[in-house]
């Protein structure tokens, strides 16, 4: 586990973004942990979050020309990641995001920000079913751009309805790499370092045995 990954887990725990317990997911599964990136909701939170996204993007080595944040959750993530890449990595890259409803006045259209072109890095909080990615791909393709990769905060490394995870399906369907700040593997490694979290570690391991990929 890299230093920034450990720091991100501690950041998520401190903001109650990452919680342990029993949580019913949309799939109906009872998960021993829950991740809600919407609780990164202050200026300092966003500044830090952008730095973690930027660190993981640079660390991945994936080349891209533009950051795209799908509405709504992807919008602040793309914005803060773009700022962090410029401030901390000297990479001043364009970014844009889509509107849910296209405007018919002013500048018009369904996109805000830089023109959507070149190799696009799509940034979001998590991938659950991959629906948002598919919607974004339609927008990216319509503008003649290509998908360089997808960047999320947490990869749950969990099977969907079939044998693959939603992330593996995205990688297969769009021939792109999905990057995450952390995966379930790092989360388990972190829990294993903390004797006081032994009960949570056992629960998460049992869940991985049942639903992991």
UniProtKB/Swiss-Prot annotation:
One Pfam family per UniProt: Pribosyltran
Catalytic reaction list: orotidine 5'-phosphate + diphosphate = orotate + 5-phospho-alpha-D-ribose 1-diphosphate
Enzyme class: transferase
Sorted UniProt keywords: Glycosyltransferase, Magnesium, Pyrimidine biosynthesis, Transferase
Keyword Transferase carried by entry: yes
GO cellular component, one term: cytoplasm
UniProt-listed GO biological process terms: 'de novo' pyrimidine nucleobase biosynthetic process; 'de novo' UMP biosynthetic process; pyrimidine ribonucleoside biosynthetic process
Keyword DNA damage in annotation: no
Biological role stated in the UniProt entry: Catalyzes the transfer of a ribosyl phosphate group from 5-phosphoribose 1-diphosphate to orotate, leading to the formation of orotidine monophosphate (OMP).
Protein name: Orotate phosphoribosyltransferase
Native source species: Pectobacterium carotovorum subsp. carotovorum (strain PC1)
Gene this protein is translated from: pyrE
């Amino acid at each position: 586990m890299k230093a920034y990954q450990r720091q991100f887990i501690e950041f998520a725990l401190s903001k109650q973004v990452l919680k342990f317990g029993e949580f019913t997911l949309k799939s109906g599964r009872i998960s021993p942990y829950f991740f809600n990136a919407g609780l990164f909701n202050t200026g300092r939170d966003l500044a830090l979050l952008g730095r973690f996204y930027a660190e993981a993007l640079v660390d991945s080595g994936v080349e891209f020309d533009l950051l795209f944040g799908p509405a709504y959750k992807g919008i602040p993530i793309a914005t803060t990641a773009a700022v962090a890449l410029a401030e901390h990595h000297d990479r001043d890259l364009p970014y844009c995001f889509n509107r849910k409803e296209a405007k018919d006045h002013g500048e018009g259209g369904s996109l805000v920000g830089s023109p959507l072109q070149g190799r696009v890095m799509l940034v979001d909080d998590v991938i659950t079913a991959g629906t948002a990615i598919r919607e974004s791909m339609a927008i990216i393709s319509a503008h003649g751009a290509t998908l360089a990769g997808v960047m999320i905060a947490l990869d749950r490394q969990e099977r969907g309805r079939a044998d693959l995870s939603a992330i593996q399906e995205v990688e297969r369907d769009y021939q792109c790499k999905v990057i995450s700040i952390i995966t379930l593997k790092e989360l388990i490694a972190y829990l294993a370092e903390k004797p006081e979290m032994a009960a949570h570690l056992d629960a998460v391991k049992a869940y991985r045995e049942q639903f992991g990929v």
